[in-house]
Curated annotation (Swiss-Prot):
GO terms for biological process: translational elongation. This is Large ribosomal subunit protein P3y. Residues 81-92 have a biased composition (Gly residues). GO terms for molecular function: structural constituent of ribosome. The gene is RPP3B. It comes from Arabidopsis thaliana (Mouse-ear cress). It holds the Pfam family Ribosomal_60s. HAMAP family: Ribosomal_L12_arch (MF_01478). Keywords: Ribonucleoprotein, Ribosomal protein. Belongs to the eukaryotic ribosomal protein P1/P2 family. It comes from the Eukaryota.
Length: 120
């Protein structure tokens, strides 16, 4: 697995990138083209597997680009949202929840009451 970190800078409409710890570099007229060139440059140094990359602007004229080659897993992203239960009885459940919250708040208030006024 290879990890390639690049520091990217824009000057005069041209983006340049130099590897943070290494000799790889590239330049292009846009960040899109620069990213494509950097991925190809990294692949020429290490072609051991799949490619993941991340481009982050630090300021309007500087950025960090990281290319990860290999590493196995494809980093799946799973976003699960609980579906709301439909049907009758929703009002009763909401009322029960409010009662539980009220009891919890009352017990928290009782826990913090030590019988003296700190600011009085």
């Amino acid at each position: 697995m290879g990890v390639f970190s690049f520091v990217c800078k824009s000057k005069g409409g041209e983006w340049t990138a130099k590897q943070h710890e290494g000799d790889l570099e590239a330049s292009a007229s846009s960040t899109y083209d620069l990213q494509r060139k950097l991925v190809q440059t990294a692949l020429s140094a290490d072609s051991s597997g799949g490619v993941q990359s991340s481009f982050s602007l630090v300021s309007p004229t500087s950025a960090v680009f990281v290319v990860v080659i290999g590493g196995g897993g494809g980093g799946g992203f799973a976003a699960g949202g609980g579906a709301a239960a439909g049907g009758g009885g929703g009002g009763e459940a909401a009322a029960a929840t409010k009662e539980e919250e009220k009891k919890k708040e009352e017990s928290e208030e009782e826990e913090g009451d030590f019988g003296f006024d700190l600011f009085g």
